[in-house]
Amino acid sequence: AKENDAPPTYLDPAGVCENSLIADGCDIQGSVKNCILFRGVRVEKGAQVENCVLFKGTVVKKDATLRCVIADKAVTIREGRTLIGDESYPVVVARNATV
């Protein structure tokens, strides 16, 4: 059986969340703008996520920058990484990948 009960999303006082749809169980300590975040996504301090769709369990490490990215389930974006796609051609990261 699937578990559909997650803790509420945590938005750090230093975190930013604008014009985004955020599911339960997320931890947002960085900046999230114009995004869709599925359950259990973590955005660490200093990370910037803009115009992205991040599926369940994705982790964006400290000081990473994502723009126009679609990340499948359980993706890890390493500390300080930059991934920038275009609105017409987003960067797509496969399930369980570490970038």
Q: Which role fits each region the language model picked out?
A:
Residues 1-99:
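Left-handed beta-helix
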